[in-house]
Amino acid sequence: MNKSTLNNPVFYVSAFVVFLLVIIGATLPNRFGAVAEKLFHFTTIHFGWFYLLAVFVFVVFLITLSLSKFGKIKLGATLTKPEYSFFTWIGMLFSAGFGAGLVFWGVAEPMSHFFKTPFPAVEAMSEEAARVAMGYAFFHWGVSQWSVFAIVGLVIAYLQFRKKRRGLISTSIQPIIGKNKFIADTVDSLAVIATVMGVATSLGLGILQMNGGLKSVFDVPTSIWVQMAIAGVMLITYLISSSTGLDRGIKWLSNINLGSLFIIIVFVFMAGPTVFILNTFVLGLGDYFSNFIGYSLRLTPYTGDTWVREWTIFYWAWSTAWSPFVGAFIARVSRGRSIRQYVLGVLVVSPAIACIWIAAFGGTAVYNDLMNGTSIAEAVNADIAVALFETYQHLPMTTILSILSIFLIFTFLVTSADSATYILGVMTSRGSLNPTLVTKIVWGLLITAIAVVLLLAGGLEALQTASLISALPFTVILLLMMASFTRMLSKGEKKAEQDKE
């Protein structure tokens, strides 16, 4: 660990706060969970409108920016070429973004909406419920969620590679708040805390999901010992990957992830109800586009229904809490892209892959329940972890598909953890693009230790809920980043025009 880390208050403050929260979560999981739940509910009830409006603004801003004259500006020097091939770049975006989550929720979400519909007037498990379920699943995994990551990544990439400044959240809002060390350290500490808590809980929940998959396929018992073994293998794998750097470990894993994802999609598409999947995809896209503004700003103040809070607002809070990590990683791998290319990759290609996955897997599950009288929706309602494997029961080569999916979840989680250790190293090394291996190992060990401790104590979901509370201040920070970026961009463009004259 170098001096830039040891002398950085961000490292000590964030490590202390995380340690404190983990101790509370491990010793008082129920009480901690109740308090975290109450605080999170307070933010979603009173500021749900703010989340929805902010994310909608992000989408409009990014699309407008990409289509404007600023779209051709490079994230780097004018002649800089992209650091990674398009396929590898998309694989990296997807792996850091939400790969492991999509593998499960690609079936679980549409089937959850099919079983309990977003609109009270729509009859559950009907043809109309299926249509609404697919449209809403597309919406939740589409451009809105990615716009949150894209804002952070765009501003940091512009600062790092165009302006040669530190790639920190605090640096990105400096034009608005000025050079205030206390505010800067507070913002960066909050980013580190949210990243550690978010990644650790996702790792823990991913381990539980993998254990569920192993039980479904190989009848491996659900036990803490199995989960600790999975955590140990995962730790060793992502520390080895981390030691090889971005150009080897994460790059290779990302290519494997995206390649495996496409292989599974193609198989399900060919072996499943092919025409139904195609129809579902096209209809789902149509519903997504036609309902985009309505879904983006949907609230239910007249009925008191909680569905939007439980789903849409929860998703936007989750995305915002994760945005410092995912956005910073996206920035790191996007050097050499123009703003227009960046928005196309992050805001169009990545969500499109997600929608294709949902259409293939969610469409197959819906088809079987509607046409063949299966009970996948009921099974998912009882246990979300079985969603994917329950769907595989109605496809050929069930065991091979299940093994491939468990492997894919594992590699996605490893890539996310590896990416997180790198970004945490950057954040706690004053923005250095090459944090030391020791710094990355320290964060890797801490993330795994937190996940295992909370698996033992049963405090994972409490810590996850607590991490989502950070979404409220981060939504404000993201809006400041957007305003700051607009100011920097207009000044930079004006200066460039003057230099030409």
UniProtKB/Swiss-Prot annotation:
Its main location: membrane. It is found in: Cell inner membrane. The chain crosses the membrane at residues 9-29, 45-65, 86-106, 137-157, 190-210, 220-240, 258-278, 311-331, 343-363, 395-415, 441-461, 465-485. The keyword Cell inner membrane applies. Pfam families: BCCT. GO terms for molecular function: transmembrane transporter activity. Induction: Induced by high salinity and cold stress. Induction is mediated by SigB, the master regulator of the general stress response. Keywords: Cell inner membrane, Cell membrane, Membrane, Stress response, Transmembrane, Transmembrane helix, Transport. It is a multi-pass membrane protein. One of its GO terms (cellular component) is plasma membrane. Belongs to the BCCT transporter (TC 2.A.15) family. Mediates the import of ectoine and hydroxyectoine, which function as osmotic and cold stress protectants. Also has minor uptake activities for the compatible solutes proline and glycine betaine. This is Ectoine/hydroxyectoine transporter. It comes from Virgibacillus pantothenticus.
